[in-house]
């Protein structure tokens, strides 16, 4: 049996995943998941990005499927933020980037002109996140599909 099929490799992969999920918890922001500064803290000078929020939702949904404690809360936060703050209620689709805080109506605020645009790249991650969260039976995930 080679390294890729070994128990040791599976344990190593599991430790790597758990470490990544632990670090990812610090990316939590009111409207999704944000960028990190070099010191590992949330960067308040950068927007909350659709691709990052979707990727984190995907990762935490995988954690739910693997039974890793604490992942449900983060997966649910991601699904809720994608549905509530990123969705463009006027023109459809999802904003590419939004502010850290919602507006007075509780909706996401596009981050300058860049956030108002729609990128297929980011939407692909949203589909991946929604499908994985649906598989993990997270509330509201199926509606994202």
Regions found by a protein language model. Name each.
Residues 1-145:
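Glycan-recognition and catalytic cores of secretory/periplasmic carbohydrate-active enzymes
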